[in-house]
Amino acid sequence: MFSGIIQEVARVDLIHHYGDSMEIGIFARNLVDGVPGSSIAVDGICLTLVKREFELLFFDVTEETMACTTIKNYTVGSMVNLERSVRLGDEIGGHFVSGHVCGVGTIIAVEKSYMFFKAPTNLVPYVLEKGFIAIDGISLTIAQVRGDIFSVSVIPETRARTSLGYKQVGSHVNMEPDMMTKMQVDTVMRFQAEKIGK
């Protein structure tokens, strides 16, 4: 479990494809307490730290993860968000994030205080005004929604401390809706489907 508060923006230093999977190495200066076996969110994707060589963190990525996230688009030099899993007693500064990416969206516009995204069809029911969403692992509040297009307010501090400062129009991002919102919407939809079926 994660909180959506990014602890470091780090650089992809190594990519090695083998079979249908791949290994990535990320150069992280500040994530000093990551040990092999621990869970770390990389752009909102929950990955297991396989090994560590000083400041270089290594992760194995499965074919399934590559298929449903932006990780397949990484190149050496890509800048990514990192967050270690929360521990008992940690402050939850954002919202609960599972690290299970539900879809890939696209940045369609960038303004001074707002960014606009196109959500994949399967996420649209869960994108609600004033609700939470994790974008590349960042806990953000949805400002406005128009169909599959939504906006979030992004303060300069967020741009500076996350990979959003490196993004541009057309960039793809990982999306995970707020799990509480998803549970509530799914329950209502299931209830309505059962009612119609009777």
UniProtKB/Swiss-Prot annotation:
Its EC number is 2.5.1.9. 2,4-dihydroxypteridine 2 binds at C46, L47, T48, D60, V61, T62, E63, E64, T65, G99, H100, V101, K130. Pathway: Cofactor biosynthesis; riboflavin biosynthesis; riboflavin from 2-hydroxy-3-oxobutyl phosphate and 5-amino-6-(D-ribitylamino)uracil: step 2/2. It catalyses: 2 6,7-dimethyl-8-(1-D-ribityl)lumazine + H(+) = 5-amino-6-(D-ribitylamino)uracil + riboflavin. It comes from the Bacteria. Disulfide bonds: none annotated. Catalyzes the dismutation of two molecules of 6,7-dimethyl-8-ribityllumazine, resulting in the formation of riboflavin and 5-amino-6-(D-ribitylamino)uracil. PANTHER family: RIBOFLAVIN SYNTHASE, RIBOFLAVIN SYNTHASE ALPHA CHAIN. Homotrimer. This is Riboflavin synthase. It comes from Chlamydia muridarum (strain MoPn / Nigg).
